[in-house]
C-alpha cells in the first residue's frame, strides 16, 4: 500500500493526523495517529479460527513505551513487559469502544495492538489510541458494522474542552472518555466533581459532535484505500434453526420465567439447553451445535424481553424501576479500621477500609513520572462468589476495571491531605454476585470509609442501569441482575451523592443509543441512587468522629527544605535511627512536610523530639540538658542537640576548682549547660557553672 494520510481539525492546536503505508505494511491494517508531538501506532490483524466458537476472540493490548518520553523504566528490568494498571485500563477502553462494531457470529481471531511511540507531556494518548485502532480495523479486511472514533471531554473554567491537554485535565471538573459512531454513542467512562445529569448529557452531546466528524473522515478514507472485507468470516444463523429452537423451548422457558427465582431459572435453562442439544443437533447440517446454541441464547433473550415489554415484569418479578432488597451491617469485622457488609439482592460485598502512613501509598510509574496514590480501591472477585471453581492469582482486567471505577466514584468525596493525612486503602471482597458488583463496591466502600472515621464530604452510592431495546421501544431497567446484563443491550453504571454524579461507565451491545435513552437512564439512576443513599444514611448518617483505636496515629511537621538532608542523613542513616529509637514510621517529602505515624502517642512525641533536635538551631544564652559525649583532660564535650556538640572547659564545670574532669563527669552523663558563645568557626562554648547561678 502506498503512503496515505488525512487530518481532522478538532480545535486550535488539536489536529488529528492519520497515516498508513509507511510502517508495518504486512499487518492487515496499520495506522499512525499524531496530535502535536504525541504519536500512537495501532495495528489490526485477524486469523481464521481452527473451529467455530460462540464468542468473539477479540484482544486489545495498549502499551506506553518509556522511550516515547525520553525515559527508561525505574525498575530493575528496563524492558517493557507486564502491563501497568493504566495500560490495562486503556486497553479496556479501546476494547469496549470497538467490540460493539463487529458483526454477530464473526469467526475470526482479532488482535489490536497500540503503542505510544512519542509523548510530548501535553497531549494525552488514550483518545488517539481509540481512533488509531478504529482506523486500522476500518482499512483492514476485518468485517465491521460501523466506524468508531473516540475523544476525551473536559470542563475547564465552565467551558467544554475536546481532548484537553494534561494541564487542562488537571484543572478540569470532568474527565470523560467516550466513543461512538457518527450517529450514536457506544461507550462512555468518566468521573467528575458532582456534575448534574444535565451537565453529563451536555458533555456527551459536545463530544459526539467531534466523534461524528472523525468517523466521517475515517469512513471516507476507508472507501478510498480500505481492503475488501472478508464477509465470509461472518456466519449466518438460518431462520428455520431459530424458529425450531424457539418453538421447542417456548412453553417450558415461559413457565421457568414465572418462577421469579434465579436458581430455579438457571436449573431449567441448563436442562432445556441439554434437551435442545440432544434433540435438535445434527452435525453436517444447519442444525450444528454452534447454531443450535446461538439460537437457544437468542430464544431466551427474546422471551425475557417479551416479558418486560408486554407485562413490565422482570425475570425476578420486579418492575422496571424497582431495586432489589438491601441490607447493611457496618463494623462487621472487629479488628479492621472500618468495614461494611453490603448486600443487594444476590450481590454482596465485604468492604474493608485500612488507614496508614505515607509508606502505605500505592506507588506507580508512567510517562509523566513517578507518583504515589494516597487513596486506592482494590476489587476482589473470587470464583466462589458465583458458585464456580477458578483461578486465584493476580487480578484480571475485569477486576482492575471494576476497582478503578469504584475508586473514582469515591475519590471525589475524600478530604484533603492537610485535613486528613492518612493513606486510605479500601478493598471490596465480592462474596456473592448477581450483577452490579462494582456498584456494591461503591456503596460498601463508602460505608467502610465512614466506619473508619474518614471525614468524607458526603455519602456515595452507585447503581447499574440496563436497557431492553425492542421493536423501536426502549425500556430502561434499574439495578440490573446478571441475566439482564448478559441478555440485555446496555450496562450503564452511575455513582454519586445527593448533590451530583462522581463516576459513570456505559457499555452497550447494540450499535448505539440515543440522547433520549441516556437522558431517561440518568434520570432513573438518580431516583435509584437517592433510594440507596436513604437506606445507607439510615444505618450511618455521618462518619465516626474519630479513627479506629486500632488505626495508627498520624501527625505532621513542617521543616525548612534546607533541613531535609539533615533529617535523612547520609544514606538515610539519620532517619533510620529516628525510626528505630521512636518506633514510629517517618516519611518526608520534597517540600519538607513530615508525616509521623505510630500506634502510640509516645512514639510520635519521641520522633518529633528527635526531629526537632536535628532541625532546631542552638541559641546563645539558652540552657540545654546535654549528653556528655567524651571526656578530655581540659574539659568535656557535650551534645546539646542531635549533631550539635560543644566544649565545656574544665574551668566552666563548677564554681569550685576541678582538678580531674573524670572525677566530675563521665561519658554518657546528662549535664545541664548554658551556651555562652559561638565562634567564627561555629564552635560552641558551654558552661555548667553558669547554670548554677
UniProtKB/Swiss-Prot annotation:
Its main location: cytoplasm. One of its GO terms (cellular component) is cytosol. It is an enzyme of class 2 (transferase). It is found in: Cytoplasm. InterPro entries: ExoRNase_PH_dom1, ExoRNase_PH_dom2, ExoRNase_PH_dom2_sf, KH_dom, KH_dom_type_1, KH_dom_type_1_sf, NA-bd_OB-fold, PNPase. Its cofactor is Mg(2+). One of its GO terms (molecular function) is magnesium ion binding. Its EC number is 2.7.7.8. CDD domains: KH-I_PNPase, RNase_PH_PNPase_1, RNase_PH_PNPase_2, S1_PNPase. One of its GO terms (biological process) is RNA processing. Keywords: Cytoplasm, Magnesium, Metal-binding, Nucleotidyltransferase, RNA-binding, Transferase. It catalyses: RNA(n+1) + phosphate = RNA(n) + a ribonucleoside 5'-diphosphate. The keyword Lipoprotein does not apply. Mg(2+) binds at residues 485, 491. Residues 621-689 form the S1 motif domain. Signal peptide: none annotated. Gene3D superfamilies: GHMP Kinase, N-terminal domain, K Homology domain, type 1, Nucleic acid-binding proteins. Residues 552-611 form the KH domain. HAMAP family: PNPase. Belongs to the polyribonucleotide nucleotidyltransferase family. NCBIfam families: polynuc_phos, PRK11824.1. Involved in mRNA degradation. Catalyzes the phosphorolysis of single-stranded polyribonucleotides processively in the 3'- to 5'-direction. This is Polyribonucleotide nucleotidyltransferase. The lineage of its organism: Bacteria, Pseudomonadati, Chlamydiota, Chlamydiia, Chlamydiales. The gene is pnp.
